[in-house]
Amino acid sequence: MEHYLSLFIKSVFIENMALSFFLGMCTFLAVSKKVSTAFGLGVAVIFVLGLSVPANQLVYSLLKDGAIVEGVDLTFLKFITFIGVIAALVQILEMFLDKFVPALYNALGIYLPLITVNCAIFGAVSFMAQREYDFGESVVYGFGAGLGWMLAIVALAGITEKMKYSDAPKGLKGLGITFIAAGLMAMAFMSFSGIQL
């Protein structure tokens, strides 16, 4: 149990996808203008990561040498299978949001299908394969990585909403000041890197 707790804390804070590895920055910067939209996208990313990392762990275990047929190693297919599983889960999420939460579906717009190619999603799945997590570890890691990404985007959206009323220099208004805020947040999250779990 302690191992899973340390893996969860590590994936949320120490190895934050957005602020430590800088993965998923396109949607991270583009959707971080309103807290409500950022929260909705964060929940969507938690859903996709929470399901795609363990699902891809199961698929990857079938691709390993001797898993299906003795002497056949299909691990060279891992990238295409990872992308296929992620795309299927995002399509399910998109259909669900369109049917049951149309306001969030419309607010996310083009960024919802872009979760399919969000490098934070693919990065978490690749880290799972590289670190050889078992199924339980992949569930904890997927949920923790998604929660960490959501924490980062909601915090940046809150800062961005407050900065609308600030007196920033004209050249830094908009994306410039957002980059500075994201950089300062990343530096703050670097303080977690010295923690050994």
Curated annotation (Swiss-Prot):
**E.C. no:** 7.2.1.1
Q: Where in the cell is it found?
A: Cell inner membrane
- Which GO terms of type biological process are on file? respiratory electron transport chain; sodium ion transport
Q: Which GO terms describe its cellular component?
A: Gram-negative-bacterium-type cell wall; plasma membrane
Key words, A-Z: Cell inner membrane, Cell membrane, Ion transport, Membrane, NAD, Sodium, Sodium transport, Translocase, Transmembrane, Transmembrane helix, Transport, Ubiquinone
Its membrane topology is listed as: Multi-pass membrane protein
Q: How does it assemble?
A: Composed of six subunits; NqrA, NqrB, NqrC, NqrD, NqrE and NqrF.
* Family to which the UniProt record says this protein belongs: Belongs to the NqrDE/RnfAE family.
Q: What is this protein called?
A: Na(+)-translocating NADH-quinone reductase subunit E
Originating species = Neisseria gonorrhoeae (strain ATCC 700825 / FA 1090)
